A protein has these predicted regions:
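Long, low-complexity, Lys/Arg-enriched
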Residues: 1-98, 115-329
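Conformationally flexible catalytic loops at phosphate/diphosphate-handling active centers
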Residues: 101
Length: 329
């Protein structure tokens, strides 16, 4: 069984290492850490520091950035972060992993949305980390931490376990009833009367129709649930082009796609023909992606996915198109 920590991350990377230390002290070794961040510069510095620190300790790091947003302060950013969080939890539930979720880092909005995502898709444990030491808390901010020597960073990232308060938070995971919730939001019949009562009491449906808030919620769940299953193995990147002018750009994009889409099992480079769309499906399970390099030549990748139906493949294509649009490609 694989143990995974999902953590929201802002300008204090120590909340992640403190969570790992407490879990380890409880006999729960974490094999992989998923870090949810924005593209804010402080969050990126925190991510860089943690990636190096945790990788050196043999812990896998999987960064998931909410592209195009420096903060979660608009309706669009809220929708994007919520979908990303739900996707991560859904994929790990499908894989049968034990998921521990920390909401100690990042903006308050990120913590609130992550908590809501856990209410929907569940987790092994949801918790908050508190260190009752103002001086240590100030030192652990990335703007102070990044300029310290490695041994000084180590002391701040891993304080005495007795200083760390681990606050477990209760929740009720609705994952087993997701399909009924989606049906009810669509106004379709469901055998569970209590689901409609729950959605109605929370302002998500009215007169058997979704409210404006319910439509937004349905939009998120609809996209998450329509995605193909996560790839059971680590995705393979097979690139044939060796020319230096291609190699760096195409490797960068391949790795970004690998991190972003769990339904991708293999990534290959390919030729692009003039007049082709930027994203197109190639049945039964492939998506071809074209992106301009900005250096006078064209690059293309073929993504082999886990899609089993045309609907799943089209849903995956739509997600790739949204990604390309946000990347301004």
């Amino acid at each position: 069984m694989k143990n995974v920590l999902i953590a929201t991350l802002g300008e204090s990377p120590a909340v992640v290492t403190e969570a790992l230390d407490v879990l380890k002290n409880r006999g729960i070794p974490i094999h992989e850490v998923v870090l949810l961040t924005t593209i804010d510069s402080a969050a990126e510095e925190s991510l860089n520091l943690l990636t190096g620190h945790l990788s050196a300790a043999g812990i896998g790091v999987h960064p998931v950035q909410v592209e195009a947003y420096k903060d979660i302060d608009t309706d669009e950013a809220v929708m994007e972060f919520m979908e990303v969080a739900c996707n991560q939890l859904r994929d790990m539930q499908k894989r049968g992993w034990d998921v521990y979720v920390s909401v100690a880092g990042g903006r308050k909005t990120m913590s609130a949305l992550m908590t809501l995502a856990v209410q929907i898709y569940g987790a092994k444990e949801l918790f908050h980390i508190i260190v009752d030491d103002p001086d240590l808390e100030e030192k652990s901010r990335i703007e102070n931490l990044m300029y310290l020597r490695e041994e000084e960073q180590e002391e701040i990232l891993h304080p005495d376990i007795s200083k760390i308060k681990f606050v477990s938070m209760p929740f009720i995971g609705l994952f087993p009833w997701i399909s009924d919730i989606v049906k009810a939001l669509k106004g379709e019949a469901t055998d569970r009367k209590e689901i409609k009562e729950l959605l109605s009491s929370n302002g998500l449906i009215e007169d058997n129709k979704p409210t404006s808030l319910g439509k937004r919620f349905l939009d998120i769940l609809g996209r998450v649930e329509s995605m193909p299953e996560p790839c059971p193995e680590e995705p393979e990147i097979k690139l044939s082009r060796k020319e230096p002018k291609y190699k760096e750009d195409i490797e960068k994009m391949a790795n970004k796609i690998k991190r972003r889409f769990s339904f991708v099992c293999e990534i290959r480079d390919a030729d692009w023909r003039r007049g082709e769309p930027k994203v197109k499906v190639e049945h039964p399970d492939r998506i071809k992606v074209y992106f301009p390099s900005g250096k006078g030549y064209n690059l293309s990748l073929i993504l082999r996915t886990t899609a089993k139906t045309r609907g799943q493949l089209e849903a995956a294509k739509s997600e790739v198109e949204r990604f390309m649009e946000r990347e301004k490609l």
